[in-house]
Structures are given as structure tokens and as C-alpha cells.
Amino acid sequence: MTPARDRVRRHRERLRRQGLRPVQIWVPDVNAPEFRREAHRQSELVAAGEHEAEDQAFVDAISVDWDDA
């Protein structure tokens, strides 16, 4: 095996000994044009909704200011 492959194998073995297991999931491609269009469409619906102020307050409350983190 190559040194990199050996390191990865040992790392995965350590994680398994700790009781962990690998999980693979498929997620939307946020760079895909269809994803961007749909995200924009949904954001416009939320912004135009009757609860826009409450929705924005919620987002603000759970958001992290990365400059302060």
C-alpha cells in the first residue's frame, strides 16, 4: 500500500475502535444552477410572506457572527 493509503486505513481503524462507523450521504449540489434557482425562489417566497419579520428574527437569533466567533 502507499503511505497515504496506510495512513487512511490506520485512521479509519482507530475511529472504528472508538465505536464509530463511516456514513455516506448524498446532498444537493449547491453549485448547480437548478439548486440556486430553487433557493432563490424559496427565499423570495419567505421574504414576501406575512411572517417575514418573525422569520428573519429567528434566522438572526440562530446565526453566528463569524468575526466575533
Swiss-Prot record:
Reported phenotype of the disruption mutant: The mazE-mazF operon is not essential. A triple TA mutant (missing vapB-vapC, mazE-mazF and phd-doc TA systems) survives antibiotic challenge, suggesting the TA systems are not required to generate drug-resistant cells. However the mutant is more sensitive to oxidative and heat stress, and does not survive long term starvation during aerobic growth on complex medium. There is a difference in the level of branched-chain amino acids, which may play a role in monitoring the nutritional supply and physiological state of the cell.
Inducing stimuli: Constitutively expressed during exponential growth and early stationary phase, it decreases in late stationary phase; part of the mazE-mazF operon. Negatively autoregulated by one or both of MazE-MazF.
Pfam families: MazE-like
Keywords assigned by UniProt, alphabetized: Repressor, Toxin-antitoxin system, Transcription, Transcription regulation
Annotated InterPro entries: MazE-like (IPR021558)
Function field: Antitoxin component of a type II toxin-antitoxin (TA) system. Neutralizes the effect of cognate toxin MazF. In M.smegmatis 3 TA systems (VapB-VapC, MazE-MazF and Phd-Doc) may be involved in monitoring the nutritional supply and physiological state of the cell, linking catabolic with anabolic reactions.
Subunit structure: Forms a complex with cognate toxin MazF.
Protein name per UniProt: Antitoxin MazE
Organism: Mycolicibacterium smegmatis (strain ATCC 700084 / mc(2)155) (Mycobacterium smegmatis)
Designated gene of the protein: mazE
